[in-house]
Curated annotation (Swiss-Prot):
It is found in: Nucleus; Cytoplasm; Cell projection, Axon; Cell projection, Dendrite. Gene3D superfamilies: Phosphorylase Kinase, domain 1, Transferase(Phosphotransferase) domain 1. This is Mitogen-activated protein kinase pmk-3. The modification Phosphotyrosine is found at Y287. It comes from Caenorhabditis elegans. InterPro entries: Kinase-like_dom_sf, MAP_kinase, MAP_kinase_CS, Prot_kinase_dom, Protein_kinase_ATP_BS. It holds the Pfam family Pkinase. The lineage of its organism: Eukaryota, Metazoa, Ecdysozoa, Nematoda, Chromadorea. Activated by phosphorylation on threonine and tyrosine.
């Protein structure tokens, strides 16, 4: 096995371990896993204020549990004044019991067997597609694990959104890789005729790379060493090799969708924007990624037929940010984004302009030609202040290429000299089959809802899935 960098030493395996709750995942820092402590350079008063706010939030959450559970279940009968385990009657496709808990004014249905104590639940964040909390549960293999519960936001609002939910629930069941998150549970408390809420449970994989990079910027001290950076890049490529071999494009690679443990084990998260490339499809959308990590062909040309090489561009943006600590192309809107890209990577040459015209139109070519022309800069000069290795610069130059047909592939990248110390071909798996998502046909939002219901009904739990009390393993 290749060695793995950590905050204080180099452990011996890069295969992800399923850890007990006593050793929760955390970023590679020397901060305690079990106590909230201020960083060395953190302002004490600010930290104390944040701790008081967190305690107040926990107190409010505790007060809301009983009230919201009663409202959601209609059960006003209490065993005693201290009783807080108010469970619904068996409901949903598998007739499970739930406790309804209010977190940040959002009601979460948490299945029986999961920890619902106020101090055990943590709100991790939310976005346009859902909200995520962290708790723990005893799993089928007997271990108690930290898990992340994602409640999808308005999953069946329209056909486009409903198809996205279907893809994510489908892919999280298909993915089986050390560096890729997978579904440990998929459930709903609703009945089929009133199916509205979808929950997906995954392992809690640690803090996001975005949070770690932000910590570096906020506290003014570097957390990730050169060895960390190299190992992170290797693991992303290792995961992309598997994803791309299944003819899947992730489409949303960014620091916020990557998580790290204390041992620097990496997991790719959130497959809500991923999709299959198995069949020719002209419905690939332009505005899928966070703009800063979008490839030029996603921003302007080939917007209907870009390939998984767009993921490789995103990897280049992430690699550069790992080196410098700052986003590489922080554009405010598409035109500004494109200008930032060409200022570093150069404007399209005649060969690429011809491809753009052939694949799109002369009008698109004319627009691109109207921008200020830039020559590609010397990456060694641009990044010299950060003392990167020659191999790092060489890989970065091959990732950040305007013409996707000349961009390095994942199969080539994993063999690059920069990653030689971690490369282990026999432990860099490909998918054993092409993933057919059955999502290319147009459907109504109700038809997509029916498809998601079937995914929940047919979900096969893993050995690491939370145990359902009193129910035989399925």
């Amino acid at each position: 096995m290749a060695s793995v960098p950590s905050s204080s030493s180099l452990p011996v395996s890069h295969v992800r371990r399923h850890e007990d709750v006593s050793t929760p995942s955390a970023p590679p820092t020397k901060r305690s896993n079990n106590q909230s402590q201020p960083p060395e350079s953190y302002e004490p008063n600010t930290w104390l204020q944040q701790q008081r706010e967190q305690e107040q939030q926990k107190k409010l959450a505790a007060e809301n549990i009983k009230k919201q559970s009663i409202e959601a279940t209609g059960n006003n009968e209490m065993v005693g004044e201290e009783e807080e385990d108010i469970l619904s009657k068996p409901c949903g496709p598998h007739k499970r019991r739930f406790q309804f808990v209010m977190i940040r004014n959002i009601t979460f249905a948490i299945p029986e067997g999961y920890d619902v104590e106020p101090n055990s639940i943590e709100y991790l964040g939310g976005g346009s597609f859902g909200n995520v909390i962290k708790t723990s549960a005893v799993c089928r293999d007997g271990l108690r694990r930290y898990v992340a519960i994602k409640k999808m936001r308005e999953p069946f609002f329209d056909p486009h959104h409903a198809r996205r939910i279907f893809r994510e629930t489908k892919l999280l069941q298909l993915m089986r890789h050390d560096n890729i998150i997978c579904a440990l549970d998929i459930y709903t408390p609703d009945e089929e005729n009133d199916f509205r809420d979808v929950y997906v449970v995954t392992e809690f994989a640690g803090r996001s790379l975005y949070q770690i990079l932000k910590q570096q910027r906020d506290y003014g001290r570097r957390v990730l060493t050169d060895e960390h950076i190299k190992f992170i890049i290797y693991q992303i490529i290792r995961a992309l090799k598997y994803i791309h071999s299944a003819n899947i494009i992730h489409r949303d690679l960014k620091p916020g969708n990557l998580a790290l443990t204390d041992d620097s084990d990496l997991m790719i998260l959130d497959f809500g924007l991923a999709r299959s490339l198995e069949k020719k499809d002209t419905s690939l959308t332009q505005y899928v990624q966070t703009r800063w990590y979008r490839s030029p062909e996603v921003i302007y040309w080939k917007i209907d037929s870009y390939t998984n090489l767009a993921d490789m561009w995103s990897l280049g943006c992430i690699a550069a940010e790992l080196l410098t600590g700052e986003p590489l192309f922080p554009g405010d809107e598409p035109n500004a984004q494109y200008q930032r890209i060409t200022q570093l990577c150069g404007s399209p040459d005649e060969e690429l302009l011809t491809k753009i015209e052939n694949d799109n139109s002369s009008a698109i070519k004319a627009v691109i030609q109207s921008y200020t022309t830039h020559k590609r800069r010397n990456f060694r000069d641009v990044f010299s202040a950060h003392n990167p290795s020659e191999d790092f610069i060489d890989l970065l130059e091959k990732l950040l290429v305007l013409d996707p047909e000349k961009r390095i592939t994942v199969e080539e990248a994993i063999q690059h000299p920069y990653l030689a110390e971690f490369s282990l071909p026999e432990d860099e798996p490909r998918a054993d089959h092409i993933f057919d998502l059955d999502d290319s046909q147009a459907r109504t939002r109700f038809e997509w809802r029916d498809a998601v219901w079937k995914e929940i009904m047919n979900y096969k739990r893993l050995s690491s899935s939370p145990l359902i009390p009193g129910e035989a393993d399925r």
